[in-house]
Curated annotation (Swiss-Prot):
One GO cellular component term: U1 snRNP
Name used for this protein in its record: U1 small nuclear ribonucleoprotein C
Subunit record text: U1 snRNP is composed of the 7 core Sm proteins B/B', D1, D2, D3, E, F and G that assemble in a heptameric protein ring on the Sm site of the small nuclear RNA to form the core snRNP, and at least 3 U1 snRNP-specific proteins U1-70K, U1-A and U1-C. U1-C interacts with U1 snRNA and the 5' splice-site region of the pre-mRNA.
Job description of the protein: Component of the spliceosomal U1 snRNP, which is essential for recognition of the pre-mRNA 5' splice-site and the subsequent assembly of the spliceosome. U1-C is directly involved in initial 5' splice-site recognition for both constitutive and regulated alternative splicing. The interaction with the 5' splice-site seems to precede base-pairing between the pre-mRNA and the U1 snRNA. Stimulates commitment or early (E) complex formation by stabilizing the base pairing of the 5' end of the U1 snRNA and the 5' splice-site region.
A GO term for molecular function: pre-mRNA 5'-splice site binding
UniProt-annotated stretches for the region Disordered: 70-89, 125-216
A GO BP entry: mRNA 5'-splice site recognition
Assigned protein family: Belongs to the U1 small nuclear ribonucleoprotein C family.
């Protein structure tokens, strides 16, 4: 009759049967041997992993196995990209020379930025003198509208606009005529003036019958 060999206990059982196996597997010695066996395997595997990592670090100069990260930085941040410590704040940007930022390269028509005080500074070629300085010219006056006194001639070949009533300029298209002086803001002529609307006759005027006379 074949015998059963227990790998944990390294012994042969008397005979191969379910009752004998069950009795052996529930024994105290067998359980202790099973625990020791798996603990020994776990320690051996852990030690082998530690040895392989140590040897790889020693062979590659403490390099790591991840090719996506930079060399000599096992899982860290590349130099120059470290984060500041908490509470340190963001470092300020370095100031530009002269206080003005340089022009962006590649911009069309980019000219160098003039130094501070170039505009209006005396002795600078091309500088604009400040108002009131010797040789400074003020802003050119606004030209008068066509038709106003002192206005230049209009477009050649185009007759000048006709003056309005009273010598006033011609009103714009769709606009009302300008009222004469003393008429206020009301554009209509006063009663009795030429071209005014006839006024209503007063009550009881000659030629007007009593109220209701036209109903007879």
């Amino acid at each position: 009759m074949p015998k059963f060999f227990c790998d944990y206990c390294d012994v042969y059982l008397t005979h191969d049967s379910m009752s004998v196996r069950k009795a052996h597997n529930s024994g105290r010695n067998h359980l202790r041997n099973v625990v020791d066996y798996y603990q020994q395997i776990g320690h051996e595997k852990a030690q082998s992993v530690i040895d392989s990592i140590t040897s790889s670090y020693a062979a590659e100069g403490q390099a790591h196995a991840n090719p996506m990260l930079p060399q000599n930085q096992p899982g860290g941040v590349p130099p120059g990209l470290g984060f500041p410590p908490p509470g340190a704040g963001v470092p300020p940007f370095p100031p530009f020379p002269g206080g003005m930022p340089p022009p962006f390269p590649g911009m069309p028509g980019g000219a160098p930025v003039p130094p501070p005080g170039a505009f209006g500074a005396p002795g600078v070629p091309g500088g604009i003198p400040p108002p009131g300085a010797p040789g400074a010219r003020g802003m050119p006056p606004m030209p008068p509208f066509p038709g106003m006194p002192g206005a230049p001639a209009g477009i050649p070949g185009v007759p000048p606009p006709m003056p309005g009533p009273g010598g006033l300029p011609f009103p714009p298209p769709g606009g009302l005529p300008f009222p004469p002086p003393g008429a206020g803001n009301f554009p209509f002529p006063p009663p009795g003036a030429p071209g005014a609307f006839p006024g209503m006759p007063p009550f009881g005027a000659p030629g007007q019958g009593p109220p209701g006379a036209d109903k007879r």
